[in-house]
Amino acid sequence: MNKSSTKTLIALSMMAVSSGVSAHGYVSETNDGIAGSRAALCKFPTSDTQEKNRDCGAVQWEPQSVEGPEGFPEKGPADGQIAGAGLVQFSELNEQTADRWVKRPITAGAQTFEWTFTANHVTRTWKYYMTKQNWNPNAVLTRDSFDLTPFCELEYNMEKPPLYPNTFSHECIVPEREGYQVILAVWDVGDTAAAFYNVIDVKFDGNGGVVDPTWSQGGQINPTRDLNVGDRVFTRVFDTSGENASLSTELVIENETQGQANNWTHALATKINKEQQNIGAGQLNDKGEFSPQYGSNPVYLKAGSGLKSVEIGYQLETVEPVYHLDIEGLASEYTIGDSATELDLSLYATGDMNVELTVYNHGKEALANTNVTLKDGEAKSVVMALSKSEKGHHMLVSRIKNMDGELIKQDMSDFHLVEEAVTPPPSGDFDFVFPEGVKGYKAGTKVLAEDGNVYQCKEFPYSGYCVQWTETATNFAPGVGSDWSMAWDKVN
């Protein structure tokens, strides 16, 4: 039963611990986090059950970039687009049904939320919102889905949290709920007009939870891949003596439709329930009945059976090709000069592939793009000239496709453009920086010229040339004018 939530305002304490990933930030469960975000679980499997969200689109390559307008709930992403932060490229995150996403177990009370930051912006606050107990899990997320009073709000006084490979954790008091709920975590940064939106799919004990004590989860069927006709997928059952092959359930893929990831997982769970007495697969209700799902299916073991765990094995008819791209030569910083900034890169391919490289600035404006075809083992050099060079954070996005045009992998690397440090002019050995005070120059006057050198005005009668300068008549300009040597002597 839903109870009124308590809002927690906490002074932060940092726990910097080792992590692993690659440009902004997301809710993670790498170390001590209670649950990873929907976006994070599109890229990284859970640590215990190895579950992973599927069919996520582009966010599987960059869960750290779910960034939208700040100001939630008064402003921010529109209703129906909250999970994807209003970004078209992350629209898959906005899909919402009771069984669409992996759910992480949680209980009310003190819980640790963990963030991984790949660009550590200065921070105003973190805020956490929870869906109402009576929300509709089969309707897109709107403001009406949530209790708009954050149950946890944390100030950070415009400081920067620790950067990857460290994680950052803080504690919140989670209100009581039952069953499937969604937490919305909002990271409000202080150096842009944006915020990062991470929804977290969680499941509380209570209605919809496992209430039959005779069953405990011993494994998970995850829709990790599509299978081909003739491929085999099977359970590997372990008891106190090791693997028990006699309890294995095997499914042979008979057609292309059955080979789709969400379909074969449902079919395998159904077959397990028909063949096994001490193993069940799917959602377990309070009557002890299993309902196979089109997608992830928990695998349960009966108490007293002596069974310990279940793993999933594959026997594939075809060997999948290996693809890998190494990009060398990308610097962490480039100094802005008079000419266009250039990235001089070297590409090394494993597998035949088409590579698309795009450079974006922090505002996600494309500044350069190139396409390269590489054969297995081939290396090529690429020079990318940026259309404009402004200081700040930039990103190089690489997309690898096979020769059929199917996306294999997308990666993103960060770099920064910085302004060239201005060397202060030497002090104490000149009177003016030319052409300051030009009409007052006389014999012996020393000036710092445009070329960085110091010049001294000649003695009479040549000193009269030193004052003969305008923006359109520059022939006596020291060091650079066509007749400068008639008026000036170079000092250094």
UniProtKB/Swiss-Prot annotation:
Residues 24-204 form the Chitin-binding type-4 domain. GO terms for cellular component: extracellular region. Probably interacts with GlcNAc residues. May promote attachment to both epithelial cell surfaces and chitin. Residues 1-23 form the signal peptide. It comes from the Bacteria. It is found in: Secreted. It holds the Pfam family GbpA_D3. The gene is gbpA. This is GlcNAc-binding protein A. It comes from Aliivibrio fischeri (strain ATCC 700601 / ES114). Keywords: Chitin-binding, Secreted, Signal.
